[in-house]
A protein has these predicted regions:
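C-terminal helical "tail/cap" subdomain of flavin- and related membrane-associated enzymes
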Residues: 267-354
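A conserved beta-strand/loop capping segment in the N-terminal third of enzymes
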Residues: 48-104, 109-111
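N-terminal Rossmann-like FAD-binding beta1-loop-alpha1 element of flavoenzymes
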Residues: 2-31
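Predominantly flavin-linked oxidoreductase catalytic cores and closely associated redox partners
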Residues: 100, 104-216, 229, 233-234
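FAD/FMN-dependent oxidoreductases across multiple families
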Residues: 190-269
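FAD-binding beta-loop-beta segment adjacent to the flavin cofactor pocket
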Residues: 166-169, 223-240, 250, 295-301, ...
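Conserved Rossmann-like nucleotide-cofactor binding loop
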Residues: 13, 39, 129
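N-terminal FAD cofactor-binding segment of flavoenzymes
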Residues: 20-24, 29-73, 141
Length: 354
């Protein structure tokens, strides 16, 4: 008898869906997850903004109420009141999902790679897409560093040292993971995938510049090219999940929060109605993200100052809400904060006028 559900790909979205199914004692049939290397998830880090009533569901391991952006001497520092910045390790996500799968008699993780459509009542495809389908690429290299003494970094550096490049925007992401651990991650939003070796060298230079007199060691590295929108559709062998299914934010790459909620809703719908409602991003989010991607392609030199002004003019909670949900009200708040001339010219497609 064919499985009730077959999930192809066991990354964040595939395992999140499986874990959501595991919350039900009895399922209509078997649930299979095909993933040749589930341990890959353990090398990743997921960050997101959340409200206190979301803590139990999103399960942050590290939290911070302060975040900042900078370009040269210009700095915008936020302190959230309603929203907090949270981080969860891929290791914790993986271990939690594997425990849930192991404890459920009807769910099984199979170490296999599937490239053709399997037989099942419901099939989900969460495989990564080919990089040549990306509209814009977010390239990053991260190093997690363990210090012998407290590193003294109190705020999350969302986008520090922002500079325009020939192909987009480069910045460093600095994430405190407790008092003695720090994730340093040089990132590019780029029309041409960045060279990992260059980003890695910039990470090392950042550590020398800022912590040259401290003792530390690198305990983990991570790197990836992730999509910021798609210029062409990939061929799916099931209902698309994760980045493939539009669950990651085109303009930022944030996806953990959306994926967790979307996969939980999919599991509930299947259990109650045995149907899947297609995932759709809010229209306001699609519009805002496309505007930002067009600026990356046409006027990357204008982006650092635009982002600094937005961060300076928006309240911290409005900024966080826009980054996570982007409702029509969130978009209106963004437009009020953004510099009028660059956004108006971008809306008209007159990028040379910016």
């Amino acid at each position: 008898m064919d499985p009730w559900v077959h999930i192809v790909g066991g990354g964040l979205s595939g395992l999140s869906l499986a874990a959501s199914f595991a919350r039900f004692d009895t399922l209509p049939g078997r649930v299979l997850i095909s993933e040749p290397n589930a341990e890959t998830l353990a090398t990743k880090t997921f960050s997101f903004w959340f409200t206190e009533d979301e803590r139990e569901f999103l399960k942050p391991e590290h939290t911070n109420g302060y975040w900042r952006l900078s370009q040269g001497p210009d700095v915008a520092v936020h302190r959230g009141q309603h929203y907090t910045y949270g981080t969860r390790s891929g290791r914790d996500v993986l271990d939690s999902a594997l425990d849930a799968i192991h404890d459920h008699a009807q769910i099984e993780l199979i170490p296999e790679k599937i490239v053709t459509k399997p037989e099942a009542t419901h099939i989900f495809d969460s495989r990564p897409c080919d990089i040549d389908t990306y509209h814009v690429t977010q390239s990053f290299v991260g190093i997690e560093v363990l210090f012998e003494q407290p590193h003294g970094t109190a705020e999350v550096g969302l986008m520090e040292r922002m500079v325009a490049t020939d192909s987009g925007l480069r910045f460093v992401y600095v994430l405190p993971l407790g008092t003695d651990r720090l994730l340093v991650e040089y990132t590019e939003f780029t029309t041409t995938p960045a060279d990992f070796s260059v980003l890695g060298a910039l990470n090392e230079q950042y550590l020398r510049d800022n912590f040259g007199n401290q003792s530390y060691r690198i305990v983990r590295t991570e790197s990836a090219h992730i999509p910021m929108g798609f210029k062409q559709r990939s061929q799916h062998i099931g209902i698309p999940l994760g980045a493939r299914g539009g669950m990651t934010r085109d303009a930022t790459g944030y996806g953990y929060r959306t994926i967790r909620y979307a996969c939980d809703q999919i599991a509930k719908d299947l259990m109650q109605y045995d149907v899947v409602r297609p995932f759709h991003r809010p229209v306001a989010m699609v519009w805002a993200d496309r505007l930002f991607l067009n600026l990356i392609q046409h006027r990357p030199d204008a982006i650092p100052q635009i982002l600094i002004q937005i961060a300076t003019q928006m309240t911290p909670d409005k900024f966080a809400a826009f980054m996570m949900t982007c409702s029509p009200l969130d978009l209106l708040n963004l437009l009020r904060a953004a510099p009028a001339r660059p956004f108006t010219c971008a809306l008209l497609g007159r990028y040379r006028w910016i």
